[in-house]
Structure formats: structure tokens, C-alpha cells
Amino acid sequence: MQKVSLNGVEVMPFTSELELLDYVDSHKGILVAINAEKILHATEQTRQIINRNLGYCDGSGAMMALKQKGFKNAIKIPGCELWLKIIARFNTEKSFYLIGGKQEVIEETVGKLRRDYPGINIAGYRNGYINSDEERRDLIDTVARIKPDVVFVAMGSPKQELLMEEIQRRHQAIFQGLGGSFDVYTGRVERAPKWWVDHNMEFAYRLMRQPSRIKRQIHLVKFAFWLTCHKL
């Protein structure tokens, strides 16, 4: 399977979740969720990180762009679901390290994972508040020493991608950026109901619940224009 370039951002057009999970089982690298915002506004540094690793289709915009390029069977794989499917498949085979959220959020996330997946090997975790270069170095040293198989980083883009690449230089593993997935998993943030997700309308649901997101959603108008004009 070949990567597809969308405005210089390379995306793997997976046709099933199983294909991506099989990739996780046989490769190492950073999994980056690709949506319209990343396609339009990725910095050169972020674009290089994505293209050296694995971009997968997380948003409806990215999925439509792939279909427009002829990959009719490409599917959207939401990152907030993918990390749990990775755990469900590999929780007895691989070790995990979690980074992100407030201290109470990461502790609740770890506790819930241990209840939901008895026997899961959580090699370590810490909150996402890194306040100094020394703390950053200590975290990287810790992960390199523990050598987990999978590292989840929930800090939002581009912070999480930059941190994952730094850790990757010291320790090869599967990395996945999760944004606010720990908040969703612990029930602090409500995800859009299934109907909205299935009909590629999750962005509209979020906008209704959080009107302050309107500035972030404006890029969707530009993205739709680009799709219409075949500029991707």
C-alpha cells in the first residue's frame, strides 16, 4: 500500500481498521491522525514528522480527499477509538506508557484501563504538564529506560508530535497522539453520538456544543473549496 499526498501531507489510505492494527503489530513509528486542519495548516516541521512516519485518516475531510483521488474504499479511523482498539488487541502482548492530561485525569485513565483490561501492562504514566527542559529530559530518559512497546501522548497538536519525535530518537516504539482522548475516555468530555459520527457530522455536533470552536471550523470552508477545485 502506497501513501497518498494531500497538500504535501502523506496519508496511508487504509480500507479497514484491521489493516492499521496489523501495521501496529509489525512496525514502529509515530501514528498521526490526519484531518482537514492538518492537511491545510501543518507546519513544515509537523509535515516532515508525519511523512517520516504514518499519517492515517482521522477526519471526514481527509477521507473525502482520498476518495477524490481514487481511493474509494478508504475509511476514517478516529484516533479516539483507535488507541482503545490497539489496547484491546495487544493488552496482554505489549507494554504501554501514557502521557497527558491533568494528574487526576491520567490517574483516572490508568485506573479505568486496568478495570476494563485486566492484566494490561502499563509500564508507566505521567501528566502532560512539562514545565521545564529538565522535566522533558527526565521524561524522555524514563521512557528510554523502561522501553515500552506503545507510547500514547495526549497533549494536542503539534505539542504531542514534537514530543513523540524527541522520545523516538531515544527509543523506537509505536507512538500515537491522542489529543483530548483521555478526557473522553474518563467521561469528562462527551463525544458526539453515534449517528453524528456515522454521518460524518461530528464537527457540527462539537460546534453546537462549543460555539467557541467556530474559529477552528472556518478552515473547513477553505478545505471544501480546495476539494471542489481539486487543489489537493
PLM-predicted stretches and their roles:
Residues M1-I75, E81:
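N-terminal nucleotide/polyanion-binding subdomain common to many enzyme families
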Residues M63-Q68, R191-L232:
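A transmembrane-helix-recognition feature enriched in membrane-embedded lipid enzymes
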Residues V143, K147-S157:
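Proline-aspartate-enriched helix->loop->beta-strand connector
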Residues L40-A42, I106-E107, K159-M164:
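Short, well-ordered alpha-helical microsegments
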Residues M63-T142, I146:
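Conserved beta-alpha
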Residues A62-M64, K159, S181-T186:
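Short gly/pro/ser/thr-enriched loop/turn and capping motifs at secondary-structure boundaries
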Residues G55-C57, A74-K76, G119-Y125, H171-G179:
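Short hydrophobic/aromatic-enriched beta-strand-loop microsegments
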Residues N127-N131, A173-R209:
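Short, flexible loop segments at boundaries between secondary-structure elements
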